[in-house]
Amino acid sequence: MDLKLVFRIAAVIAAINGLGLLFMGATFFAMANMTATPNLITVGQFTGVTVLFLALLQWRIPDIAGDAFSSLGQLFAIGYAMWFLIVGYHIMTGQAGGAAAYGNLVVEAVLAVLFYMQSKKSE
């Protein structure tokens, strides 16, 4: 496995989440034990488009980053660690739960570690 593959895996996962938020917001929020109000679905749709943009960015970074490739991998390691912390906090405080929240927690932890390890190898 190399850093390019980690970016591509993260991009596919982000695209799935982005499309889910955009087109199946009520289902996504229900899986996280949240009540899907019309306002929450609207915010979810906006977030879905944002996550789709991040997926596109993650897919393209290996091709366009040049000398900054390893540094961007380290930056994404920090980003995934931050997502891990906020989802963990939401689980601990009871604001999110269920398989979706725990699944995201695991995925974010794995991606944070992979981004960090592979970016160090690429230096």
Residue ranges of model-derived segments:
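Non-cytosolic membrane-interface motifs at loop->transmembrane helix junctions
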Residues: N33-I41, S70-S71, A96-V106
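Membrane-helix boundary elements
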Residues: L3-V6, A14-I41
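Core segments of alpha-helical transmembrane spans in multipass integral membrane proteins
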Residues: A15-L22, N39-P62, L75-M82
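Membrane-embedded alpha-helical segments of multi-pass transporters/permeases
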Residues: L22, W59, G88, A112-Y116
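Hydrophobic alpha-helical membrane segments
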Residues: L72-V87, V107-V110
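Membrane-water interface at the C-terminal end of transmembrane alpha helices
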Residues: A109-E123
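Interfacial segments of alpha-helical transmembrane regions
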Residues: M1-V12, F69-L72
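Membrane-helix boundary connector in multi-pass membrane proteins
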Residues: D63, L85-Y102, K120-K121
